[in-house]
Amino acid sequence: MITYAEALRLLLSEAKPIEDTETIPLMYSTGRVLAEDIASPIDVPGWDNSQMDGYALRVEDIASASQDAPVRLPVAERIAAGKIGGPLLPGTCARIFTGAPLPPGADTVVPQEDVSREGDVVAFSQTPQIGAWVRRQGSD
């Protein structure tokens, strides 16, 4: 058996940079490695959107939430994937589904599994990080 340092030295001594490249049709590129970075001319995704089914909100509206003292917010609207919601008013949340655009004013999504809902009011018992469960415009 050889040491880690010796194994690393052997690997590095045998590794050679790839200097030859070729241009091939995309359909034949499976299993290949790009020779240089490519950049999309458009943002993917094209807008901030939800990564989960849940509730879009402003973190500042539930900053004091805890297990002992949950913060309750009314549901102002329902935003399905492919639909655009209106601006989120302070002190409210929006029911949002995976892929749906984040409404203006919201900065975070809380998954439906992490809340309790009674009628049109949702109880939040923890404060997420700003940007949680949000796929940002251009992040891909």
How would you name each of these model-derived features?
Residues 2, 56-140:
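Short, glycine/charged-enriched hinge/interface segments at domain edges or termini
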Residues 1-67:
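Short, low-complexity N-terminal leaders and the immediately following helix N-cap/first helix
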